[in-house]
Amino acid sequence: MGLAKLVEDYTQSEAASLAQQLRDQLADYSQAYYTQDAPLVEDHVYDELYRDLEQLEAAFPVIVTNDSPTQKVGGQVLPGFTKVTHEIPMLSMGDVFSEAELAAFDQRLRKNTATEIEYNVELKIDGLAIDLIYEKGRFVRGATRGNGTIGEDITQNLKTIKAIPQKLTRPVSIEVRGECYMPKAAFADLNQKREAEGQAPFANPRNAAAGSLRQLDAKVAAARQLSAFIYTIVTFDDVQATTQSEALHVLAELGFNVNPTSVVCQNMAEVQAFIEQYQGTRNDLAYGIDGVVLKVNDLALQRQLGNTVKVPRWEIAYKFPPEEAETVIREIEWTVGRTGVVTPTAVMDPVQLAGTTVARASLHNADMLRDKDVRLLDTVLLHKAGDIIPEISQVVLAKRPSDSQAYGIPTTCPSCGHDLVHLDEEVALRCINPMCPAQMKEQLTHFASRNAMNIDGLGPRIITQLLEKELIHDVADLYRLTADDLAQLDKFKEKSINNLLNAIDASRQNSLERLLFGLGIRHVGAKAARLLAEHFQNLAALMASDQETIITVDTIGTIIADSLVTYFADSQVQTLMAELEAVGVNLTYTGVTKAQAATSDSYFNGKTVVLTGKLEQYTRGELKQLLEDNGAKVTGSVSKKTDALIAGQDAGSKLEKAQSLAIPIINEADLDNYLAQ
């Protein structure tokens, strides 16, 4: 292999001809690898041909074609993802979790149809739903599901995935859907690299895949080794298939990567056999699955059965029960949180569970540790809550060592040595030392967070260094930091120093509610902080108020009032507030008052609004605040009194109810237009 002569010795015509041969050859190899699961050549052979093509295209840029394999790795950094409308909505899928529920689904369908039913049964890939559009055989657009109606255009990132063909085997126009996923090996490799670089590992392959597809730089997505299976034809004028199994065959013939495991089942006994087969071997697969999907095989019957507002009536997902694994507890660690809560974590022999290695599991609090009677050297059963969070199900008492002793709950803080307290009506142990280093780190992280003082660039890693070098001791010290101070931090150069100092300086002007929330006063969340700041208008007035005065604020009760009075009565807190004022932090409310919001000419003024789904541009709290500033009343449930529903991604029952009541639905893409009205 390798080019027959030096690249500069080729004419443009020769180079164009050879490049096209290489493209065709690479396309065949790629299809065999991804579609037929039968590689024709070793990986290194593919790589050498790929490099030959790269050399030719680099020497003769005019011969590059849009569907060339070399164009799958995008070099374009997108300014942002544009929203796209799904002409045919990407609905959710109903799920069941037991054989009885699955049988009930089957009986319901058979009762409502006059014909015999067979199912196409497929593995439920644990990934991210995608929609692909091809025109005359060429890939032109790819999108996420979004909220089912509005998705995001992620075409450039999807072009980096080898399993998604740029060009089909026939010049047809078609819309298809499938699942993008990260193979287990790629996930393990990615997390290993992230941990080596000091980054937090992804929780699971699905999150990793979703995060990769949302990268604005397609090169980042390309490096993540994503793959995809296609399983649905949405629109295709030339389709001859009459069943789902035939449709999968058509997809494979067109060059799509189709999962080869699907089978047609005539009855529930055959379905159950398929479930048992893959429930027992799921960890042997190169990709993650979390169940199987049953689809009525007859496409005409699918159309006859139709959909509910949210899900198709002709398909269902059977979710596998959580897997369990057995391991031994070697240590119990205690960590201190922002509010002084001390939490136990079991450190165990590493064990494979649901496709990942688990060596730690939270025990949540001292009471749970006592109730479960977890001890050192105990053998325990683990499962993953929601297939994500490791939890101890039970202690295997038959394997407990004969000399085992009940675990002693600590009485002093593992960080500062201060006595721990168990407050009335709480399950948590607490360290109440305000100068506890572990608490200080968490408090500073909270203070700088997005919903509090919003100091961009001030994260846990920087805060840890600032504390270790004794450059700060409390939140007021942040506003005394200099460029010389920050220059002492590891890998902190001039640009980073200036950016952080500017962010700290800008936070001085925040309205009072951000400061109140950022201080981390017990029971005072973002909503309570806003109500208090708007009512009292300045910090001095709040600090001077007693419990009776504070509870006159709308929705503020005695628990919050007691917490505030206790907090501000502390002499150290009073000193800290004086220091914050001295360093120029704003201590007054500068937000929109209710009276101002009531006179707003905004579209939302006077309207009752409900939020649902995952929002991309805002946190839930930020959008709620913005709507209230525009005169809206934001509530948590949909009713006939609701004037509008703002729906983000993965909207659930609230969206379905709003649609049934004909309540206007506003998607996030259109929200700015409404706010501008």
From Swiss-Prot:
One of its GO terms (biological process) is DNA replication. It comes from the Bacteria. GO terms for molecular function: DNA ligase (NAD+) activity; metal ion binding. CDD domains: BRCT_DNA_ligase_like, LIGANc. It catalyses: NAD(+) + (deoxyribonucleotide)n-3'-hydroxyl + 5'-phospho-(deoxyribonucleotide)m = (deoxyribonucleotide)n+m + AMP + beta-nicotinamide D-nucleotide. It holds the Pfam family HHH_5. SUPFAM superfamilies: BRCT domain, DNA ligase/mRNA capping enzyme, catalytic domain, Nucleic acid-binding proteins, RuvA domain 2-like. Its EC number is 6.5.1.2. It is an enzyme of class 6 (ligase). Its cofactor is Mg(2+); Mn(2+). Belongs to the NAD-dependent DNA ligase family. LigA subfamily. DNA ligase that catalyzes the formation of phosphodiester linkages between 5'-phosphoryl and 3'-hydroxyl groups in double-stranded DNA using NAD as a coenzyme and as the energy source for the reaction. It is essential for DNA replication and repair of damaged DNA. This is DNA ligase. The lineage of its organism: Bacteria, Bacillati, Bacillota, Bacilli, Lactobacillales.
